[in-house]
Amino acid sequence: MSISSKIRPTPRKPSRMATDHSFKMKNFYADPFAISSISLAIVSWVIAIGGSISSASTNESFPRFTWWGIVYQFLIICSLMLFYCFDLVDHYRIFITTSIAVAFVYNTNSATNLVYADGPKKAAASAGVILLSIINLVWILYYGGDNASPTNRWIDSFSIKGIRPSPLENSLHRARRRGNRNTTPYQNNVYNDAIRDSGYATQFDGYPQQQPSHTNYVSSTALAGFENTQPNTSEAVNLHLNTLQQRINSASNAKETNDNSNNQTNTNIGNTFDTDFSNGNTETTMGDTLGLYSDIGDDNFIYKAKALYPYDADDDDAYEISFEQNEILQVSDIEGRWWKARRANGETGIIPSNYVQLIDGPEEMHR
Protein backbone atom coordinates (compact mmCIF):
# COMPACT_ATOMS: atom_id res chain seq x y z
CA MET A 1 0.00 0.00 0.00
CA SER A 2 1.35 3.43 -0.95
CA ILE A 3 2.05 6.21 1.55
CA SER A 4 -0.45 8.55 -0.07
CA SER A 5 -3.32 6.12 0.40
CA LYS A 6 -2.50 5.89 4.10
CA ILE A 7 -2.17 9.63 4.56
CA ARG A 8 -5.24 10.64 2.59
CA PRO A 9 -8.05 8.06 2.55
CA THR A 10 -10.86 8.58 0.10
CA PRO A 11 -13.87 9.76 2.15
CA ARG A 12 -17.43 8.82 1.38
CA LYS A 13 -19.43 11.59 -0.22
CA PRO A 14 -22.50 12.29 1.94
CA SER A 15 -25.78 11.95 0.14
CA ARG A 16 -27.91 15.06 0.01
CA MET A 17 -31.62 14.53 0.51
CA ALA A 18 -33.92 16.00 -2.09
CA THR A 19 -36.43 18.38 -0.58
CA ASP A 20 -40.02 17.77 -1.61
CA HIS A 21 -41.64 20.98 -2.91
CA SER A 22 -44.79 19.45 -4.38
CA PHE A 23 -48.18 21.06 -3.81
CA LYS A 24 -49.59 19.98 -0.43
CA MET A 25 -52.40 21.74 1.38
CA LYS A 26 -51.28 20.19 4.67
CA ASN A 27 -48.23 22.46 4.58
CA PHE A 28 -50.63 25.38 4.86
CA TYR A 29 -52.96 23.77 7.40
CA ALA A 30 -50.04 22.75 9.66
CA ASP A 31 -49.05 26.39 10.31
CA PRO A 32 -51.48 28.19 12.67
CA PHE A 33 -49.90 31.57 11.96
CA ALA A 34 -50.45 31.19 8.22
CA ILE A 35 -54.06 30.08 8.63
CA SER A 36 -55.02 32.81 11.10
CA SER A 37 -53.24 35.72 9.41
CA ILE A 38 -54.27 34.85 5.86
CA SER A 39 -57.87 34.22 6.96
CA LEU A 40 -58.02 37.64 8.61
CA ALA A 41 -56.47 39.18 5.51
CA ILE A 42 -59.14 37.61 3.29
CA VAL A 43 -61.95 38.88 5.54
CA SER A 44 -60.41 42.37 5.59
CA TRP A 45 -59.98 42.32 1.82
CA VAL A 46 -63.64 41.36 1.31
CA ILE A 47 -64.71 44.26 3.55
CA ALA A 48 -62.46 46.65 1.63
CA ILE A 49 -63.60 45.52 -1.83
CA GLY A 50 -67.26 45.51 -0.79
CA GLY A 51 -67.10 49.01 0.65
CA SER A 52 -65.21 50.27 -2.39
CA ILE A 53 -67.75 48.84 -4.85
CA SER A 54 -70.71 50.28 -2.96
CA SER A 55 -69.00 53.65 -2.66
CA ALA A 56 -68.00 53.81 -6.32
CA SER A 57 -71.51 52.85 -7.50
CA THR A 58 -72.94 56.06 -6.03
CA ASN A 59 -72.24 59.65 -6.83
CA GLU A 60 -69.57 59.80 -4.11
CA SER A 61 -66.05 60.45 -5.33
CA PHE A 62 -63.71 57.50 -4.86
CA PRO A 63 -59.88 57.54 -5.09
CA ARG A 64 -58.99 55.55 -8.19
CA PHE A 65 -55.55 54.46 -7.01
CA THR A 66 -57.24 52.49 -4.22
CA TRP A 67 -58.43 49.97 -6.80
CA TRP A 68 -54.86 49.02 -7.68
CA GLY A 69 -53.95 48.73 -3.99
CA ILE A 70 -56.85 46.30 -3.44
CA VAL A 71 -55.91 44.18 -6.47
CA TYR A 72 -52.25 44.16 -5.41
CA GLN A 73 -53.23 43.00 -1.91
CA PHE A 74 -55.23 40.14 -3.43
CA LEU A 75 -52.15 39.01 -5.39
CA ILE A 76 -50.07 39.06 -2.19
CA ILE A 77 -52.60 36.87 -0.36
CA CYS A 78 -52.72 34.33 -3.22
CA SER A 79 -48.92 34.25 -3.45
CA LEU A 80 -48.56 33.59 0.27
CA MET A 81 -50.94 30.64 0.10
CA LEU A 82 -49.00 29.15 -2.82
CA PHE A 83 -45.66 29.60 -1.05
CA TYR A 84 -46.98 27.74 1.99
CA CYS A 85 -48.53 24.94 -0.07
CA PHE A 86 -45.27 24.38 -1.96
CA ASP A 87 -43.19 24.87 1.23
CA LEU A 88 -41.19 27.72 -0.34
CA VAL A 89 -41.63 30.42 2.29
CA ASP A 90 -37.99 30.34 3.41
CA HIS A 91 -36.81 30.49 -0.20
CA TYR A 92 -38.74 33.70 -0.97
CA ARG A 93 -38.60 35.57 2.34
CA ILE A 94 -36.96 38.66 0.85
CA PHE A 95 -39.47 38.82 -2.00
CA ILE A 96 -42.39 38.33 0.39
CA THR A 97 -41.17 41.02 2.78
CA THR A 98 -40.58 43.64 0.10
CA SER A 99 -43.90 42.90 -1.62
CA ILE A 100 -45.84 43.20 1.63
CA ALA A 101 -44.01 46.45 2.41
CA VAL A 102 -45.29 47.90 -0.88
CA ALA A 103 -48.82 46.73 -0.05
CA PHE A 104 -48.51 48.37 3.38
CA VAL A 105 -47.74 51.71 1.70
CA TYR A 106 -50.69 51.32 -0.68
CA ASN A 107 -53.15 50.49 2.11
CA THR A 108 -52.04 53.25 4.47
CA ASN A 109 -52.32 55.78 1.65
CA SER A 110 -55.81 54.53 0.77
CA ALA A 111 -56.82 54.61 4.44
CA THR A 112 -55.81 58.27 4.66
CA ASN A 113 -57.91 59.17 1.61
CA LEU A 114 -60.97 57.17 2.69
CA VAL A 115 -61.09 58.07 6.39
CA TYR A 116 -61.18 61.81 5.79
CA ALA A 117 -63.44 61.65 2.72
CA ASP A 118 -67.16 62.43 2.83
CA GLY A 119 -69.74 59.68 2.41
CA PRO A 120 -71.06 56.97 4.76
CA LYS A 121 -70.28 54.10 2.36
CA LYS A 122 -66.58 54.86 2.45
CA ALA A 123 -66.45 53.85 6.14
CA ALA A 124 -66.55 50.13 5.28
CA ALA A 125 -63.78 50.53 2.69
CA SER A 126 -61.61 52.50 5.12
CA ALA A 127 -62.11 49.86 7.84
CA GLY A 128 -61.02 47.14 5.42
CA VAL A 129 -57.81 48.88 4.32
CA ILE A 130 -56.93 49.75 7.93
CA LEU A 131 -57.20 46.08 8.91
CA LEU A 132 -55.09 45.13 5.89
CA SER A 133 -52.45 47.66 6.95
CA ILE A 134 -52.24 46.12 10.42
CA ILE A 135 -51.95 42.59 9.02
CA ASN A 136 -49.26 43.71 6.58
CA LEU A 137 -47.26 45.22 9.43
CA VAL A 138 -47.40 41.92 11.33
CA TRP A 139 -46.29 40.06 8.21
CA ILE A 140 -43.34 42.40 7.73
CA LEU A 141 -42.23 41.72 11.31
CA TYR A 142 -42.47 37.94 10.82
CA TYR A 143 -41.15 37.43 7.29
CA GLY A 144 -38.52 40.14 7.65
CA GLY A 145 -36.92 38.42 10.65
CA ASP A 146 -34.69 35.36 10.68
CA ASN A 147 -36.11 32.05 11.87
CA ALA A 148 -33.76 32.24 14.86
CA SER A 149 -35.24 35.55 16.07
CA PRO A 150 -37.22 35.41 19.35
CA THR A 151 -40.52 36.46 17.74
CA ASN A 152 -40.27 33.91 14.94
CA ARG A 153 -39.31 31.11 17.32
CA TRP A 154 -42.27 31.91 19.56
CA ILE A 155 -44.70 31.99 16.62
CA ASP A 156 -43.29 28.82 15.02
CA SER A 157 -43.50 26.97 18.34
CA PHE A 158 -47.24 26.64 17.78
CA SER A 159 -46.75 25.07 14.36
CA ILE A 160 -47.19 21.33 13.92
CA LYS A 161 -43.96 21.13 11.91
CA GLY A 162 -42.03 22.90 14.67
CA ILE A 163 -39.45 25.66 14.54
CA ARG A 164 -38.09 26.41 11.10
CA PRO A 165 -34.32 26.04 10.53
CA SER A 166 -32.28 29.22 10.49
CA PRO A 167 -30.06 29.76 7.42
CA LEU A 168 -28.14 32.41 9.35
CA GLU A 169 -27.21 30.09 12.23
CA ASN A 170 -26.40 27.31 9.78
CA SER A 171 -23.98 29.47 7.79
CA LEU A 172 -22.31 30.77 10.97
CA HIS A 173 -21.71 27.24 12.28
CA ARG A 174 -20.24 26.09 8.98
CA ALA A 175 -17.98 29.14 8.71
CA ARG A 176 -16.76 28.56 12.28
CA ARG A 177 -16.00 24.90 11.55
CA ARG A 178 -14.08 25.77 8.37
CA GLY A 179 -12.05 28.31 10.33
CA ASN A 180 -11.19 25.76 13.01
CA ARG A 181 -10.17 23.22 10.39
CA ASN A 182 -7.89 25.64 8.53
CA THR A 183 -6.04 26.78 11.67
CA THR A 184 -4.96 23.27 12.75
CA PRO A 185 -2.55 21.85 10.09
CA TYR A 186 -1.37 18.30 10.55
CA GLN A 187 2.04 16.85 9.80
CA ASN A 188 2.80 13.17 10.11
CA ASN A 189 6.25 12.79 11.66
CA VAL A 190 6.36 9.05 10.91
CA TYR A 191 6.75 9.94 7.24
CA ASN A 192 9.78 12.19 7.94
CA ASP A 193 11.32 9.72 10.42
CA ALA A 194 11.11 6.82 7.96
CA ILE A 195 12.79 8.85 5.21
CA ARG A 196 15.56 9.98 7.58
CA ASP A 197 16.22 6.45 8.89
CA SER A 198 16.41 4.99 5.39
CA GLY A 199 19.07 7.48 4.28
CA TYR A 200 16.87 9.56 1.98
CA ALA A 201 16.37 12.68 4.06
CA THR A 202 14.84 14.95 1.42
CA GLN A 203 13.35 18.37 2.15
CA PHE A 204 9.65 18.19 1.32
CA ASP A 205 7.46 21.28 1.53
CA GLY A 206 4.15 19.59 0.77
CA TYR A 207 2.81 20.11 4.31
CA PRO A 208 3.16 22.88 6.92
CA GLN A 209 6.44 22.45 8.78
CA GLN A 210 5.68 22.01 12.47
CA GLN A 211 7.28 19.63 14.95
CA PRO A 212 5.05 17.85 17.48
CA SER A 213 6.66 16.48 20.63
CA HIS A 214 6.43 12.82 19.60
CA THR A 215 5.69 10.69 16.56
CA ASN A 216 2.20 9.93 15.32
CA TYR A 217 0.82 13.05 17.01
CA VAL A 218 -2.52 14.63 16.16
CA SER A 219 -3.44 17.95 17.75
CA SER A 220 -6.24 17.66 20.29
CA THR A 221 -7.65 20.89 18.91
CA ALA A 222 -8.02 19.25 15.53
CA LEU A 223 -9.81 16.28 17.03
CA ALA A 224 -12.26 18.50 18.94
CA GLY A 225 -15.61 18.35 17.19
CA PHE A 226 -14.30 15.57 14.85
CA GLU A 227 -12.64 18.10 12.57
CA ASN A 228 -11.09 16.96 9.28
CA THR A 229 -7.34 16.66 9.90
CA GLN A 230 -6.25 15.08 6.64
CA PRO A 231 -3.72 17.16 4.65
CA ASN A 232 -4.43 18.45 1.17
CA THR A 233 -2.22 16.67 -1.36
CA SER A 234 -2.16 16.93 -5.12
CA GLU A 235 -1.52 14.21 -7.67
CA ALA A 236 2.07 15.37 -8.06
CA VAL A 237 2.61 15.02 -4.32
CA ASN A 238 1.11 11.52 -4.36
CA LEU A 239 3.47 10.51 -7.17
CA HIS A 240 6.41 11.87 -5.18
CA LEU A 241 5.33 9.92 -2.11
CA ASN A 242 5.00 6.67 -4.08
CA THR A 243 8.51 7.14 -5.48
CA LEU A 244 9.92 7.68 -2.00
CA GLN A 245 8.10 4.56 -0.78
CA GLN A 246 9.81 2.43 -3.41
CA ARG A 247 13.21 3.90 -2.56
CA ILE A 248 12.66 3.25 1.15
CA ASN A 249 11.66 -0.37 0.54
CA SER A 250 14.72 -0.91 -1.68
CA ALA A 251 17.03 0.54 0.94
CA SER A 252 15.49 -1.60 3.68
CA ASN A 253 15.92 -4.79 1.63
CA ALA A 254 19.55 -3.93 0.89
CA LYS A 255 20.34 -3.41 4.56
CA GLU A 256 18.71 -6.72 5.51
CA THR A 257 20.81 -8.59 2.94
CA ASN A 258 24.19 -6.99 3.76
CA ASP A 259 23.91 -6.78 7.53
CA ASN A 260 22.20 -9.73 9.25
CA SER A 261 23.21 -8.46 12.67
CA ASN A 262 20.98 -5.39 12.18
CA ASN A 263 18.10 -7.44 10.85
CA GLN A 264 15.92 -6.75 13.86
CA THR A 265 16.60 -3.00 13.66
CA ASN A 266 15.69 -2.80 9.99
CA THR A 267 12.54 -4.80 10.57
CA ASN A 268 11.46 -2.41 13.30
CA ILE A 269 11.94 0.53 10.96
CA GLY A 270 9.74 -1.02 8.30
CA ASN A 271 7.08 -2.08 10.73
CA THR A 272 7.00 1.26 12.47
CA PHE A 273 6.61 3.00 9.14
CA ASP A 274 3.64 0.83 8.13
CA THR A 275 1.72 0.56 11.36
CA ASP A 276 2.08 4.04 12.81
CA PHE A 277 0.12 5.47 9.92
CA SER A 278 -2.82 3.35 10.97
CA ASN A 279 -2.42 4.03 14.71
CA GLY A 280 -1.85 0.36 15.50
CA ASN A 281 -4.82 -0.89 13.53
CA THR A 282 -4.08 -2.04 9.98
CA GLU A 283 -7.76 -1.97 9.08
CA THR A 284 -8.13 1.76 9.67
CA THR A 285 -6.59 4.91 8.16
CA MET A 286 -6.03 8.49 9.22
CA GLY A 287 -9.64 9.43 8.55
CA ASP A 288 -10.89 6.35 10.35
CA THR A 289 -8.95 7.38 13.49
CA LEU A 290 -11.88 9.69 14.10
CA GLY A 291 -14.16 6.67 14.13
CA LEU A 292 -16.48 7.98 11.44
CA TYR A 293 -16.16 5.15 8.93
CA SER A 294 -15.33 2.14 11.09
CA ASP A 295 -17.87 -0.47 12.12
CA ILE A 296 -19.03 0.48 15.59
CA GLY A 297 -21.29 -1.58 17.76
CA ASP A 298 -24.70 -0.44 18.96
CA ASP A 299 -23.45 -0.18 22.54
CA ASN A 300 -21.27 2.85 21.71
CA PHE A 301 -24.27 4.93 20.59
CA ILE A 302 -25.81 5.27 24.04
CA TYR A 303 -28.01 8.31 23.33
CA LYS A 304 -31.01 8.91 21.13
CA ALA A 305 -31.85 12.26 19.58
CA LYS A 306 -34.78 13.54 17.54
CA ALA A 307 -34.22 15.95 14.65
CA LEU A 308 -36.08 19.22 15.22
CA TYR A 309 -35.86 20.15 11.53
CA PRO A 310 -34.09 18.81 8.41
CA TYR A 311 -30.41 19.36 7.71
CA ASP A 312 -28.46 19.08 4.45
CA ALA A 313 -24.81 18.13 4.80
CA ASP A 314 -22.16 20.45 3.42
CA ASP A 315 -20.53 19.22 0.20
CA ASP A 316 -17.17 20.59 1.37
CA ASP A 317 -17.20 18.48 4.55
CA ALA A 318 -17.20 14.72 3.99
CA TYR A 319 -17.88 13.99 7.67
CA GLU A 320 -21.30 15.67 7.88
CA ILE A 321 -24.47 13.65 7.32
CA SER A 322 -27.92 14.76 6.27
CA PHE A 323 -31.10 13.91 8.12
CA GLU A 324 -34.80 14.62 7.94
CA GLN A 325 -37.10 16.33 10.40
CA ASN A 326 -38.36 14.11 13.26
CA GLU A 327 -35.79 11.43 12.35
CA ILE A 328 -34.46 9.42 15.29
CA LEU A 329 -30.65 9.35 15.43
CA GLN A 330 -28.25 7.38 17.62
CA VAL A 331 -25.62 9.59 19.26
CA SER A 332 -22.38 8.51 20.93
CA ASP A 333 -20.93 11.86 22.02
CA ILE A 334 -22.95 14.87 23.20
CA GLU A 335 -20.16 17.33 24.00
CA GLY A 336 -19.45 20.36 21.81
CA ARG A 337 -21.44 21.90 18.99
CA TRP A 338 -21.08 18.86 16.71
CA TRP A 339 -22.12 15.39 17.79
CA LYS A 340 -21.18 12.04 16.36
CA ALA A 341 -24.34 10.23 15.26
CA ARG A 342 -25.62 7.34 13.18
CA ARG A 343 -28.79 7.14 11.10
CA ALA A 344 -31.12 4.18 10.87
CA ASN A 345 -29.60 3.18 7.51
CA GLY A 346 -26.15 2.86 9.12
CA GLU A 347 -24.70 6.14 7.81
CA THR A 348 -22.31 7.60 10.39
CA GLY A 349 -20.97 11.14 10.70
CA ILE A 350 -21.34 14.40 12.62
CA ILE A 351 -24.45 16.53 13.10
CA PRO A 352 -25.05 20.04 14.52
CA SER A 353 -26.26 19.80 18.11
CA ASN A 354 -28.69 22.71 17.77
CA TYR A 355 -30.69 20.81 15.13
CA VAL A 356 -31.56 17.86 17.39
CA GLN A 357 -32.95 17.20 20.85
CA LEU A 358 -32.10 14.32 23.17
CA ILE A 359 -35.10 12.11 23.86
CA ASP A 360 -33.50 9.34 25.90
CA GLY A 361 -30.78 9.07 28.54
CA PRO A 362 -27.72 6.80 28.37
CA GLU A 363 -28.50 3.15 27.86
CA GLU A 364 -26.89 0.40 29.90
CA MET A 365 -23.73 -0.86 28.25
CA HIS A 366 -24.47 -4.55 29.06
CA ARG A 367 -28.03 -5.73 28.68
UniProtKB/Swiss-Prot annotation:
Q: Where is the composition biased (Low complexity)?
A: 259-272
Describe the location of the SH3 domain by residue ranges.
300-361
User: Which residue spans traverse the membrane?
Assistant: 33-53, 66-86, 94-114, 123-143
Provide the topology term for how it sits in the membrane.
Multi-pass membrane protein
**Per its UniProt record, what Gene3D superfamilies does this chain match?**
SH3 Domains
Give the sugar-modified residues.
N59
Which residues face the membrane's Extracellular side?
54-65, 115-122
GO CC terms: cell projection; cellular bud neck; plasma membrane
Example of a GO biological process term: regulation of actin filament polymerization
Question: Which CDD domains does this entry report, sorted A to Z?
Answer: SH3_Sho1p
Q: Which residues lie on this side of the membrane: Cytoplasmic?
A: 1-32, 87-93, 144-367
Q: What is its main location?
A: membrane
Post-translational modification Phosphoserine, affected residues: S166
Highest taxon above the source species: Eukaryota
Q: Where in the cell is it found?
A: Cell membrane; Bud; Bud neck; Cell projection
Q: Which UniProt keywords apply?
A: Cell membrane, Cell projection, Glycoprotein, Membrane, Phosphoprotein, SH3 domain, Stress response, Transmembrane, Transmembrane helix
Sequence segments annotated as region (Disordered): 252-276
Q: Which protein family is named in the record? A: Belongs to the SHO1 family.
What is known about its subunit structure? Forms homooligomers. Interacts (via the SH3 domain) with PBS2. Interacts with FUS1, STE11, STE50 and RNA polymerase II.
Briefly state the protein's biological role.
Plasma membrane osmosensor that activates the high osmolarity glycerol (HOG) MAPK signaling pathway in response to high osmolarity. Detects changes in external osmolarity and activates PBS2 through the stimulation of STE11 and targets PBS2 to the plasma membrane. PBS2 activation leads to changes in glycerol production that helps to balance the intracellular and external osmotic pressures. Activates also HOG1 in response to heat stress and mediates resistance to oxidative stress. Involved in the regulation of the mating pathway. May be a receptor that feeds into the pseudohyphal growth pathway.
Q: What is this protein called?
A: High osmolarity signaling protein SHO1
In its UniProt entry, the species of origin is given as Saccharomyces cerevisiae (strain RM11-1a) (Baker's yeast)
Gene symbol of the encoding locus: SHO1
